[in-house]
Amino acid sequence: MKQGIHPNYREVNVTCSCGNKFVTKSAMEKENFNIEVCSLCHPFYTGTQKIVDTTGRVDKFNNKFGNLFKR
């Protein structure tokens, strides 16, 4: 690797909006970085993910436009 062309690699303090804090390494200039979602509060990891039921939407569409496509 060439010398002097790579950015400095330093520790960065990451703070989530849920209050979780951790330290990671990055080439970014700032020492502190704020995020909105982390693995402790993301719905996929917490199991609070909602499944959208589209059946009602399909029925509503068919009631409104169903007779337009019949032959």
Curated annotation (Swiss-Prot):
Organism: Neisseria gonorrhoeae (strain ATCC 700825 / FA 1090)
One cellular component term from this protein's GO annotations in UniProt: ribosome
The encoding gene: rpmE
Binding annotation for Zn(2+): 16, 18, 38, 41
Any one Gene Ontology BP term: translation
Keywords associated with the record: Metal-binding, Ribonucleoprotein, Ribosomal protein, RNA-binding, rRNA-binding, Zinc
PROSITE patterns: RIBOSOMAL_L31
InterPro entries: Ribosomal_bL28/bL31-like_sf, Ribosomal_bL31, Ribosomal_bL31_A, Ribosomal_bL31_sf
Free-text function comment from the UniProt entry: Binds the 23S rRNA.
Cofactor(s) listed: Zn(2+)
Entry's Gene Ontology molecular function annotations: metal ion binding; rRNA binding; structural constituent of ribosome
Full protein name: Large ribosomal subunit protein bL31
Oligomer and partners: Part of the 50S ribosomal subunit.
A Pfam family reported for this protein in Swiss-Prot or TrEMBL: Ribosomal_L31
